[in-house]
Amino acid sequence: NLIMLDEALIYNSHHFFGLTSVFNPDAVSDVEIYKGSYPVNYGGRISSVMHIRHRDGNNERFSLSGGLGLITSRLLLEGPIQKNKSSYLISGRSTFWDFLTRGAKNPTISGYRANYRDFNAKFNFDINQNNKLFFSGYAGQDENKLGLDLLRKWGNDVFSMRLNHIHNAKLFSNFTAYLSNYSYRVIEEDDKASFVGTSRITDYALKSDFNYFRNPEHIYNFGASVTFHRLAPGKRIPGVSSTNNEVDLGSEHAVESYAYFSNEIKLSSKVTMTSGLRFSQFSLLGPSDVYLYTPGVTKTINAIVDTISYAPRENIKTFFNVHPRVTLKYQLTETSALKVNYSSLVQYMHRLSNTITPSSSDIWKASGK
């Protein structure tokens, strides 16, 4: 699934193994969901799309709200920076289960941890009549330890900046830059076998989106984006007293870009047709070592026959795809519609899930040779 927060990619969308969303409902303005076919401005995943947007803070007066719960406590502040021109919204949530379990006499219970915390922030500025600037941020982390088991920590950090510009009465644009980071850590605290295992993926992206309203029944949408992916799939660092060896799977670097154009036209009061093309490109870059194996046998260390070494930023493999999409919608009622569509989708980043533990210990892998 493609999950986004204020135009930025989110790699992990839940707390408590899926029981709670990472998105604080107090800070959410709207949610856009597509199942199956979706517009050409979305891509990179082949399932569904969910785009969440922060709401703007109150630009007229300060307000404070919050609540205490058995699972989660929350707090939200919002108010004007400059009245009627700029505002802020800051919210946070946290659990306090550690305070309930640390006093237990049973070491299995006292060592139990199942906590999470997250913070949301949005600042918006009306620069002038034609320009608005938005800054959005999210930081969240889960921490889990079952008795004498390993301590696991994981979380997202996201920051985005967006400029909304009105060119004229018919043309609008959004320019966005964002940073998205997802990390996972597992910690063994036993002295003889202590270690810290880490996994991380970081994205740096620039994107632009344009909307041209030819008339109320005819809209053109077009834009482009480029994303730099840095993946560190796994590293294990032994403790001082540990007899284990350090293991490092290295890192991967990739550049993903796309451009799109779509045409939405209202054929009648109830029938709308949307057609478009999306052009995508993905390049896996060095530094990296690519192993060649004996054909027809299982890929093991003993089956390696040669190694190709690539220098930093050297191209290892490039993919290019064109994705046509067509949707015909018939509006049955105000709340229901019938859709027929054709979509071509592609996914270059792949998630390797761990089915043994319920924690979010997913590892991401880039397409390559």
Question: Positions of the model-derived regions?
Answer:
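Transmembrane beta-strands of outer-membrane beta-barrel pores
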Residues: 35, 54, 70-72, 81-83, ...
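Transmembrane beta-barrel wall of Gram-negative outer-membrane proteins
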Residues: 69-94, 107-143, 152-173, 179, ...
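Outer-membrane beta-barrel signature, preferentially recognizing the C-terminal barrel domain
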Residues: 152-154, 158, 162-166, 207, ...
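Signature of Gram-negative outer-membrane beta-barrel scaffolds
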Residues: 221, 226-332, 348
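Hydrophobic, lipid-facing positions within transmembrane beta-strands of outer-membrane proteins
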Residues: 46-48, 62-64, 71-75, 117-121, ...
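Outer-membrane beta-barrel strand-turn architecture
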Residues: 56-58, 81-83, 125-129, 165-171, ...
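Short acidic/polar hinge/loop motifs at secondary-structure boundaries
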Residues: 8-34
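N-terminal periplasmic accessory domains that precede
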Residues: 18-21, 33-36, 41-64, 75
